[in-house]
Every structure is written in structure tokens, then in C-alpha cells.
UniProtKB/Swiss-Prot annotation:
Organism: Kosmotoga olearia (strain ATCC BAA-1733 / DSM 21960 / TBF 19.5.1)
Top EC group: transferase
One Pfam family in the UniProt entry: CobS
Keywords for this protein: Cell inner membrane, Cell membrane, Cobalamin biosynthesis, Magnesium, Membrane, Transferase, Transmembrane, Transmembrane helix
UniProt function note: Joins adenosylcobinamide-GDP and alpha-ribazole to generate adenosylcobalamin (Ado-cobalamin). Also synthesizes adenosylcobalamin 5'-phosphate from adenosylcobinamide-GDP and alpha-ribazole 5'-phosphate.
Pathway: Cofactor biosynthesis; adenosylcobalamin biosynthesis; adenosylcobalamin from cob(II)yrinate a,c-diamide: step 7/7
Name of the protein this chain belongs to: Adenosylcobinamide-GDP ribazoletransferase
Primary location group: membrane
Transmembrane segment boundaries: 29-49, 53-73, 101-121, 126-146, 167-187, 211-231
Its EC number(s): 2.7.8.26
Length: 231
């Protein structure tokens, strides 16, 4: 179990983790999405406790993205470009695999960052743990109900997805019940967006990819943060 947890940290973040060769099962890292979320959440929580100055917030978000969210954000950009293209599924795959930033990705990514920074400035520090943990749980929901859209890539590597991983990942969120309203709001959004992305991706590309998983995480994190900033 510990090797799988370390593999999850190494796979989903830039936090240096010592890994023994051939230790850990890639398909089992899904059970620890929310565990990795605690690492990201505690980082953002700690940075916001130090200062809520705007320049410090920019630095906090930049470092947090570098350590924990850049991988997911890249998936968001590719997904935006691919899904807004009005064409065939094959052409969408081609656009998403290029890695270039197209007009849709540039425009909506700019809006995303502005909204993210605004919400970050207006949430309580503790809320950032809910954002990071439950935001990642939305990926479990997408994996639970979906199937990979391609026979290659990260989506395929995580398939077949063991349904019990959703429960394990949910169990890691139990400490967050300490603030029940925050938990209910965050969990509800994660469930809603994970399920919604399942239906959207089925219509667009007939399944999920690694990019779509990242986009789901980023959409969920922003939505949870905005919701918690309003209470």
C-alpha cells in the first residue's frame, strides 16, 4: 500500500519521493487521489496563512501549480481546445495530443486563472484543503462511471478501474467532515462535475483521456473554491 501511495505522489505531483524500481501498481494510484490532495491542500493552506497579500498569493498559486496542478492544468488546456472544435472525434484527439495552446485554450485559461485567483483571495485558508482533496475526488467519479476513449495514453493505463478505489479515496476524505457544510458542498460539487464530465466526454470523444481527467480536477477545484468563497 505504501509503495502505491508513493507512486501516486510521484505520478500526480512534483514532490520528490524515493521509489524502488518495479514497486507500486499504477492502476492502484487512483485509490490515493484524495491522499495526494491533502498534500496540495496543506501547501495552499500554509501559504495563505502566511499572508493574503496579492503578490504573495500569485507566488503561492504559481508554486502550488508547479508542484501539484500544472499536470492537470495542461490537461484542461488540451481538453478545451479539443472539445470546442466542431468536427470529428479523430480530429479532436489530434488537437488534444498536439499540446499546442489554441485560441479556445488561451481565452478560457485566462478566464480560469482570473477566477481562480479571485476565489483564492476570498476563501478561508481551511477551505483550500477541501478544494484540493474533493477536487481530486471528481476524477474518481469520472473513472468509476467511464471508460477510456483510446487504447493508448494515461486513460488506458488506469483501466480497468477498480470500483473499490472510489470508496477508498472517499474514506480519505472523512476527516473533512469536521466542517460538515464545507464537506457537503465540496463533495456534492465533486460528484456533480465528475458525473457531468462523464456525459460530456462520452458525447465528445466516447470516453475519458488523461487530459480529460486533469480538466475534471481543475474544473472541480475552481467550482468548489468559488462555492466556498460565497458562504
Amino acid at each position: 500500500m505504501w509503495n502505491d501511495m508513493k507512486l501516486a505522489i510521484a505520478f500526480l505531483s512534483r514532490v520528490p519521493v524515493p521509489l524502488k524500481q518495479n514497486k507500486g501498481n499504477l492502476k492502484k494510484i487512483c485509490a490515493y487521489f484524495t491522499f495526494v490532495g491533502y498534500l496540495a491542500g496543506v501547501f495552499y493552506f500554509s501559504m495563505k496563512l502566511i499572508s493574503e497579500n496579492f503578490l504573495w498569493t500569485l507566488l503561492s498559486v504559481a508554486l502550488g501549480f508547479y508542484l501539484f496542478d500544472l499536470f492537470h492544468f495542461d490537461g484542461l488546456l488540451d481538453t478545451l481546445d479539443g472539445f470546442f472544435y466542431q468536427g470529428t472525434k479523430e480530429r479532436r484527439f489530434e488537437i488534444m495530443s498536439k499540446g499546442d495552446i489554441g485560441p479556445f485554450a488561451f481565452f478560457y485559461a485566462a478566464l480560469y486563472i482570473v477566477a481562480y485567483l479571485y476565489a483564492f483571495l476570498h476563501v478561508d485558508p481551511i477551505d483550500l484543503i477541501y478544494v484540493a482533496v474533493l477536487g481530486r475526488f471528481s476524477m474518481n467519479i469520472l473513472l468509476h462511471f467511464g471508460k477510456p476513449a483510446k487504447n493508448t495514453g494515461l486513460g488506458k493505463l488506469l483501466h480497468p478501474y477498480e470500483k473499490k478505489h472510489t470508496l477508498i479515496s472517499l474514506v480519505f476524505t472523512i476527516p473533512l467532515v469536521y466542517f460538515p457544510l464545507n464537506y457537503i458542498i465540496s463533495l456534492s460539487i465533486a460528484l456533480l462535475l465528475g458525473s457531468s464530465m462523464h456525459f460530456i466526454t462520452n458525447r465528445k470523444i466516447e470516453g475519458y483521456t488523461g487530459d480529460v481527467l486533469g480538466a475534471t480536477c481543475m474544473f472541480s477545484q475552481l467550482s468548489i473554491m468559488v462555492a466556498l468563497s460565497l458562504i
